[in-house]
Amino acid sequence: MKARLPLLVGVTGGIGSGKSTVCAMLAEMGCELFEADRIAKELQVEDPEVIRGIEKLFGPDVYSRDASGKLLIDRKAIAAIVFSEPEKLAALNRLIHPKVREAFVNEVKRCAREGKRILCKEAAILFEAGADRDLDRIIVVAANDGLRLARAVARGLACEEARKRMQAQWPQEKLVERAHYVIFNDGTLDELRSQVEQVYQSLLTVVE
């Protein structure tokens, strides 16, 4: 008998919206989780083709090695460039997104083999990369701009850098328009969990 594919759910939202927190809650409730942004970061220091492409785009100085010989990448330097030069960001995305998609396809196959019912794909850039076409449902995590900015700064970003990242992403209203579910993360963790639980129960009705 052919393995049944899991329900494929995208989780996205602007910087500081809280999508990682939502995904952690969904994972606790029983969903499988594919972290596209984490995979992309791993590719930047592990995949030879990606490394060569990044060196070509940004120069070899964005890479260094620590005392043990481990390859390191200067993400701050790259971020400062790509959020000021949209064409560089587009080129970086063209380099990385096909490989992230390949990794996602492999994860879908694993979930199908193991009988997992719901696979959530967390990605900061979902619609922009056309990744929504591979998915059955989309969850957008939203919060007001002031709160999102404060959260980004609390994570260590300079205020101006956080603003640039917000401006480089799709407007939140545009994301909300294309979502199957919208989770508003403007309140307490308990209020957030209650919304996530409602969405999870709705997803279960699709797979049962």
From Swiss-Prot:
UniProt-annotated location(s): Cytoplasm
InterPro entries reported for this sequence: Depp_CoAkinase (IPR001977), P-loop_NTPase (IPR027417)
GO CC annotations, alphabetized: cytoplasm
Domain DPCK: 8-208
Chief localisation class: cytoplasm
Catalytic activities: 3'-dephospho-CoA + ATP = ADP + CoA + H(+)
CDD domains: DPCK
Pfam families: CoaE
PROSITE patterns: DPCK
EC number(s) on file: 2.7.1.24
The protein's enzyme class: transferase
Single annotated GO MF: ATP binding
Known pathway: Cofactor biosynthesis; coenzyme A biosynthesis; CoA from (R)-pantothenate: step 5/5
Keywords for this protein: ATP-binding, Coenzyme A biosynthesis, Cytoplasm, Kinase, Nucleotide-binding, Transferase
GO biological process, one term: coenzyme A biosynthetic process
Binding-site residues for ATP, renumbered to this chain: 16-21
Record keyword Kinase present: yes
Family: Belongs to the CoaE family.
Function: Catalyzes the phosphorylation of the 3'-hydroxyl group of dephosphocoenzyme A to form coenzyme A.
Protein name according to UniProt: Dephospho-CoA kinase
